[in-house]
């Protein structure tokens, strides 16, 4: 079964994964970046066999959310996964369900700190970061996309 570590980007997901991985996967309790591999991003585990090679569309990927989780859960082991996905459905495809989820750790960060973190991470000014976060038509980190140009983040 899956335990989700869910958050909006720049909210402390990696920090929580660092604490959990040090506690759960280290004999000494000491942190190393190698330990973070024990709590992967869910998007890495999505079964992409049925997705067109050049597809960047969340709709196509969302069709594989539940089937991928069913496949992951076949051995009945408890696994942690990082996600920035919302508990949503895209074209009727739910992100997860009770049959595949054991628990969720939901991380919430003060939005004022989130704005400054996003601005610093993407080298934006505070106003551009705020406008990006409050734009209802924007998403962060679409699957299969890498932001190499901060202009892509501009509102």
Regions found by a protein language model. Give the residues of each.
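PAPS-dependent sulfotransferase catalytic domain
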Residues: 1-155
């Amino acid at each position: 079964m899956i335990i989700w570590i869910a958050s909006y980007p720049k909210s402390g997901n990696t920090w929580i994964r660092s604490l959990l991985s040090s506690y759960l996967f280290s004999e000494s309790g000491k942190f190393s970046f190698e330990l973070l591999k024990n709590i992967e991003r869910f998007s890495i585990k999505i079964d992409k066999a049925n997705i067109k090679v050049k597809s960047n569309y969340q709709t196509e990927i969302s069709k594989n959310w539940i089937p991928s989780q069913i496949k992951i859960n076949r051995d009945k082991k408890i696994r942690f996964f990082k996600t920035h996905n919302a508990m949503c459905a895209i074209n009727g495809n739910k992100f997860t369900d009770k049959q595949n989820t054991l628990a969720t750790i939901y991380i919430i960060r003060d939005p004022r700190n989130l704005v400054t973190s996003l601005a610093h991470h993407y080298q934006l000014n505070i106003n551009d970061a705020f406008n990006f976060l409050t734009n209802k038509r924007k998403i962060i980190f679409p699957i299969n996309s890498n932001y190499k140009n901060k202009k892509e983040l501009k509102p």
